[in-house]
């Protein structure tokens, strides 16, 4: 069951990437910012879900590293998938933004853990 949230979340990403003409706001500038922040949030969550699933189902050292790498790999394949969707196109910039979101999420959780361990 540890992998169910990962599968659901990855499926949601895939479904959204398959939608042509995805816009959220009438203002193009605001829409751009919202979409890029959305990329960061979505892949940050994916990295954390992967971390959790790996930590509970494997004996791998540093599962956060693997979760981060797998989230970035999924970001790259997600952009490749968009090459086959009408009106969408793959973007290395988006892969970088997705990777940044995954990295920020993982780093934030690691920082919180470090700060908590210092208090006790």
Regions found by a protein language model. Name each.
Residues 1-52:
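"…centered on the first transmembrane helix and the immediately adjacent amphipathic helix/loop
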Residues 42-56, 102-113:
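Membrane-interfacial alpha-helical segments at the cytosolic side of multi-pass membrane proteins
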Residues 19-20, 55, 86, 113:
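Short helix-capping/hinge motifs at transmembrane helix termini and TM-loop junctions
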Residues 3, 33, 63-66, 110:
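Lipid interaction determinants
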Residues 25-27, 32, 75-99:
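Interfacial helix-loop-helix junctions of multi-pass membrane proteins
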Residues 117-120:
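Short, charged juxtamembrane terminal tails flanking transmembrane helices
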Residues 1, 59-68, 88-92:
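Membrane-helix interface segments
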Residues 4-15, 44, 69-73, 77, ...:
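Lipid-exposed faces of alpha-helical membrane segments in multi-pass integral membrane proteins
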